[in-house]
Regions:
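Sequence/structural segment immediately N-terminal to covalent heme-attachment motifs in c-type
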Residues: 385-406, 487
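Histidine- and aromatic-enriched segments that form or immediately flank copper-ligand environments
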Residues: 86-207, 293-326, 344-362
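Extracytoplasmic/periplasmic copper-protein system
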Residues: 35-80, 199-231, 236-238, 245-249, ...
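C-terminal motif of bacterial Sec signal peptides marking the signal peptidase cleavage site
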Residues: 28-30
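Detector for the c-type heme attachment site
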Residues: 134, 190-193, 211-213, 229, ...
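Gly/Gly-Pro-rich "capping" loops immediately C-terminal to redox-active cysteine motifs
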Residues: 392, 404-436, 452, 456-457
Length: 487
């Protein structure tokens, strides 16, 4: 039997370092395995918001304020302070939701959607709101009678009977809360009838970051809010400036038949002013479907979502998603890498919604204009006549793949000048049933000989046909004199 050899000091040190390294790895692994449970440990949550306060003191300053607020699609960095003071006053005002369409809206912060609130888990949010619905809208329009309004934060865990009570015009409500869960949460007015208040524009987003931030680093961060508008021409025939006024159509609202489905409050809202990114960047989109009644299938053409965090919580992770399905008030954070230079179109892949305006563009340095008409990228025409506006929107959503107005023939003729070549009655019959016209009308037969693809029947209503013709007349009257383009 031999005696054991005493290890050298160097060997003893190496062994100690190895044991320390293994011990640290085990501890780190244990911490990581415990961290999800720790994040949702009830004892760490704050359930002491304190009572709400309602006063008769009217605020007359800015309609929205606070370092935690973002006022457009770009999300501002998180403010350092753990105390976030925000103000979101309610107003009745006029917004533009489409070319030639001014809408009598109810708002938070005098915009639709309302400003985005950006906080983190554990922050103390100090909220105040004055009901300013009795203040005249721009141009001294009294759009609707002043009324009660309230605030419902989905990010808060509070007694709604206290915090979400309705206040009268001129009153001010204030309360505090602490967000206990990360996510992308809706806020909205909760005053009956809630449906009408949300459909009139009273909604927005609260982004609650995890205590320790997100597991990835994004190069670009944008907030996308999908919502519906249900409109009809103002029965009093008022206008906002030179733009006809539209008001809420309660019948369409109850039938779930929206006139527009939009991103960030505007028809094709981020097309003329696209979001910006660069090839190779990680883009993070905070997406909320505010409804009030429809579903969204959010998709970015040319991208695959590397990570999807349902409801905006990184613990609810999916990978490699093509489309995210969101019900009313549902949300997700989606991330993707921009693969190369180009224009990336955001759409609701329920294309009936996309045709109503749920379209946007992420411009990643496209070198030339792309032909993406089938995603409803709009032309530049902006009529103000209500029927011409509807005709324009229908033309852009259904016709741009085959026709232009002034940019030359495609699969079908350039339609600029069509009202100078054809009578309204001929156009009415053509739009009602092009397939029947081709077999019976000489002019239609000539078109069929010139263009090999016959236009299929579109099943248009009489009202839709009238709107198309009004739009064609507007385009022909607005264009510079030139030779008719259509044979």
């Amino acid at each position: 039997m031999t005696d054991a050899v005493d290890p050298s000091p160097l060997a003893r040190r190496a062994k100690a370092l190895l044991l320390a390294s293994l011990s640290g790895a085990l501890v780190l692994s244990a911490c990581q395995s415990r961290s999800p449970a720790e994040r949702y440990e009830i004892s760490r949550m704050n359930f002491n918001p304190g009572p709400a306060h309602v006063t008769q003191e009217r605020h007359t300053g800015p309609f929205a304020s606070g370092s935690a607020l973002s006022f457009d699609a770009a999300l501002k960095p998180l403010a350092r302070s753990r105390n976030k003071t925000i103000r979101l006053d309610t107003t009745h005002t006029v917004i533009r939701i489409a070319p030639g369409v001014a809408f009598a809206a109810w708002t938070f912060g005098n915009q639709v959607p309302g400003p985005t609130v950006h906080v983190r888990v554990g922050d103390r949010v100090h909220f105040s709101m004055t009901n300013r619905s009795d203040e005249p809208a721009p141009g001294a329009l009294q759009l609707s009678a002043p009324m009660m309004h309230s605030m419902d934060f989905h990010a808060a865990m509070v007694a709604p009977t206290d915090k979400y009570q309705s206040i009268a015009p001129g009153q001010t409500m204030s309360f505090e809360f602490t967000p206990n869960y990360p996510g992308v949460f809706m806020y909205h007015c909760g005053t009956p009838m809630v449906l009408e208040h949300i459909a009139s524009g009273m909604y927005g987003v609260v982004v609650v970051e995890p205590r320790d931030g997100y597991p990835t680093k994004a190069d670009r961060e944008y907030v996308i809010v999908q919502s519906e508008f249900y409109t009809k021409p103002d029965p009093q025939h008022r206008s906002a400036g030179a733009v006809p006024l539209y008001v809420l159509d309660g019948d369409r609202l109850r039938r779930k038949a929206p006139t527009y489905t939009v991103f960030n409050g505007r028809y094709n809202g981020m097309v003329a002013q696209p979001l910006i990114a660069k090839p190779g960047e990680r883009v993070r989109l905070y997406v909320l479907n505010a409804g009030p009644s429809d579903t969204s299938s959010f998709h970015v053409v040319g991208a695959i979502f590397d990570r999807v965090w349902l409801d905006g919580n990184p613990d609810n992770q999916l990978r490699g998603m093509q489309t995210v399905l969101l019900g009313s008030s549902s949300s997700a954070i989606v991330e993707f890498i921009v693969p190369e230079a180009g224009s990336y179109v955001m759409v609701d892949h329920q294309f009936a919604n996309a045709s109503q305006g749920a379209v946007g563009v992420i411009d990643a340095g496209a070198h030339e204009e792309s032909a993406i008409e089938h995603h409803n990228i709009p032309a530049s025409a902006t009529p103000t006549d209500p029927e011409a506006v509807q005709g324009k929107l229908s033309f852009e959503s259904k016709c741009l793949a085959c026709h232009t107005l002034g940019n030359g023939a495609k699969l079908g003729p350039d339609l600029l000048g069509v009202t100078k070549l054809r009578s309204d009655e001929w156009l009415r019959r053509w739009l009602a049933s092009p397939e029947a016209m081709v077999s019976a009308d000489a002019d239609a037969k000539a078109l069929r000989a010139h263009y090999p693809i016959t236009m299929p029947d579109q099943n248009l209503s009489d009202a839709e046909i009238r709107q198309y013709i009004r739009y064609f007349h507007w385009a022909d009257e607005a264009s510079k004199p030139q030779a008719p383009a259509m044979p």
